[in-house]
Amino acid sequence: MQVKETVADGLKREFEVNVPAADIDAQVDARLVDLKDKVKLNGFRPGKVPVSHLKRVYGRSVAAETIDKLVRETNDGIFAERGFRLATEPKITMPQDQKVVEDILAGKSDLNYTVAIEVVPTIELADFKSFSVEKPVVDVGDSDVDEAIKRIAEANRAYADKAEGAKAETGDRVTVSFKGTIDGVAFDGGTGEDIPVVIGSGSFIPGFEDQLAGIGVGETRTIKVSFPANYASDTLAGKPAEFETTATKVEAPQDVTIDDEFAKTLGMESLDKLKEAARARLGAEYAGATRLRVKRQLLDRLDETHKFDAPPSLVEQEFEVMWRSINAEMQQNGKSFADEDTTEEAAREEYRKIADRRVRLGLVLSEIGEKNKIQVTDDEVSRAVIERARQMPGREKEVWDFYRSNNEALAQLRAPIYEDKVVDYILELANVTEKKVTREELYKDDDADKTAA
């Protein structure tokens, strides 16, 4: 067998490989001998079928299987001998001429093929003990807890019927039935029965709630609005509509007394227990935000200290996934690049940079995990599946079965667990200092954190 490297351009490599016909024929014969004791043919006793006869019957299919196996093993040897880690699947170009193919399968001609690959670069890891990371910490104060309780009370506020003849005001809850039309024609989703609307809540199409002010029970109004340009339905976005609306109930919000009785309506033993629960929830919320900020710092530091050319094909794959998502989101929201004060060309350039960063950081994290034998256990994956199932009450078995039968979905669950374990490993070595900050400071530039690799 002969191997000749024909391309060595950056991370791209290409090889021409020659496998002598004699080597292929020898492996085919060995495979046929192995089959001799297993094949049953009419007219022959078990194990007594001549290899020459087997070759006439099965030679072509065995040769095809042998060549496929030989190509895979040869390629693996080429890559292993040179210490290559592949960024993508190798691109193999086999002979296309039918006569040449038949001669190869018949053992009359050598096999000549090319294999093109893109390799992962050698990554020199930084000294993580030199990393300095600032950990923002927010104490959960009594005022934070009180504000959280107030929000809970507002969300659970009771309403009571207003006096007969009373009109609806901002803050009141009006129960309405309506039928919507566009240019006099009813449309899907435009009809509602006994729908509660809190005036001023902003939960309906802009302008709808405002026009309910002053309405009374039994009164019918024609409410004229326009669907927002970024409305989820393309058929409705930006169009004017009329809703023939009848109020069936007008209720005023009732004062909420935040005490033990209120806490009991929420299933808590007392107000103190409700405050404990609110404090714990806020603590978990702040801890999650702190984790994101620390992780962003760490990823930025890894980006700064690991500069290398990422495999172009991986960058292109990452970019295409991001670009499809961005375009789908913009289309759904009725936005254009001009609305975002940019151009498509500038946006493409920016997202290619982000894709390059994500690929490089992914390779760095993988290298760290591999060199330090960091692994995700089956128990950790199972816990992640269970947590996902809990988020879909009533469909737990469906979720569990989905992940058990879908390796790709399991890999998507495994990836963030692996990344977090690598991050924790680095943080154990880095110099981490805590800094007290306010809630506002903790959540500053939160959007930037969301785009971190």
Swiss-Prot record:
One of its GO terms (biological process) is protein transport. GO terms for molecular function: peptidyl-prolyl cis-trans isomerase activity; protein folding chaperone; ribosome binding. Pfam families: FKBP_C (PF00254), Trigger_C (PF05698), Trigger_N (PF05697). Residues 171-256 form the PPIase FKBP-type domain. GO terms for cellular component: cytoplasm. PROSITE patterns: FKBP_PPIASE. Its main location: cytoplasm. It comes from the Bacteria. It is found in: Cytoplasm. Its EC number is 5.2.1.8. It catalyses: [protein]-peptidylproline (omega=180) = [protein]-peptidylproline (omega=0). The keyword Cell cycle applies. Keywords: Cell cycle, Cell division, Chaperone, Cytoplasm, Isomerase, Rotamase. Transmembrane segments: none annotated. HAMAP family: Trigger_factor_Tig. Consists of 3 domains; the N-terminus binds the ribosome, the middle domain has PPIase activity, while the C-terminus has intrinsic chaperone activity on its own. Belongs to the FKBP-type PPIase family. Tig subfamily. Involved in protein export. Acts as a chaperone by maintaining the newly synthesized protein in an open conformation. Functions as a peptidyl-prolyl cis-trans isomerase. This is Trigger factor. It comes from Rhodopseudomonas palustris (strain BisB5). The lineage of its organism: Bacteria, Pseudomonadati, Pseudomonadota, Alphaproteobacteria, Hyphomicrobiales. The gene is tig.
